[in-house]
């Protein structure tokens, strides 16, 4: 199962962590995994490359985990929150369609 955690800090999303494999299908044919990967890459690329936010991104191949953490001060906070909220809504819709393969939660 893929586990997605959005970090909540005072009502704003301060980052996310995505880990695990969905197990929906074999590697290369797993539409759940492909959808999660696309949402994560879109959000991370938009935040760092388009908006220019110096977010910290860590990838742990052994744990199949990617974590993105925003800096404490962010000039384009509204845009970043819109991107992360869109990512969260997209992944929640995916979870609703495939509840056995992905979980999405907000953590403090």
Listing of model-derived features with the role each one plays in the protein:
Residues 32-36:
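Short, conserved glycine- and acidic-residue-centered signature motifs
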Residues 1-31, 41, 45-108:
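N-terminal intrinsically disordered, cationic/polar leader segments
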